[in-house]
Amino acid sequence: MIMSKETLIKSIREIPDFPIPGILFYDVTTLFKDPWCLQELSNIMFEMYKDKGITKVVGIESRGFIMGPILATRLNAGFIPIRKPGKLPAEVIEESYDKEYGTDTVQIHKDALDENDVVLLHDDLLATGGTMKAACELVKKLKPKKVYVNFIIELKDLNGKSVFGDDVEVESVLTL
């Protein structure tokens, strides 16, 4: 698996100064367009969670919507979207969080989860952890049995894992 992870890392496109000057953007869409990379990513994540009893995979808009449903299918679980305000049609609950230049909000359907669910919360990249921390707090409001958090990539130098409590297992497929 070490060789496959190295191949996946080499397949990620790096875009300097995007979305603003000084930022190095890791473009995971290159993993999705390559059939081998997509399958390998799916296999690795499945192996990480196949014995955890996952009942729902929750993906964060928008790149969490790519691997989330694939993983949900493989785990025989449902898929639940977390979206920006105004995008979900039924009654929602929400969580707001601070960003570098203001605040943002994420929402989930109020009836998306219950106390019987074991949740895998997924997004593409862990940087500072703000968005996923808000998503995690949002999911916890619905009182599932357990919450796992997963990323494709973790930017280790930004120490995003530190925002999560000890009650949440946070794992990444790749660490940069």
From Swiss-Prot:
A GO-annotated cellular component: cytoplasm
Catalytic activity: AMP + diphosphate = 5-phospho-alpha-D-ribose 1-diphosphate + adenine
Subcellular location: Cytoplasm
Keywords of the record: Cytoplasm, Glycosyltransferase, Purine salvage, Transferase
Quaternary structure note: Homodimer.
MF term (GO), any: adenine binding
Main location: cytoplasm
Pathway listed: Purine metabolism; AMP biosynthesis via salvage pathway; AMP from adenine: step 1/1
E.C. designation(s): 2.4.2.7
Name listed for the protein in its UniProt record: Adenine phosphoribosyltransferase
GO biological process: adenine salvage; AMP salvage; purine ribonucleoside salvage
InterPro entries linked: Ade_phspho_trans (IPR005764), PRibTrfase_dom (IPR000836), PRTase-like (IPR029057), UPRTase/APRTase (IPR050054)
Signal peptide segment: none
NCBIfam families, per the entry: apt, PRK02304.1-3, PRK02304.1-5
Function: Catalyzes a salvage reaction resulting in the formation of AMP, that is energically less costly than de novo synthesis.
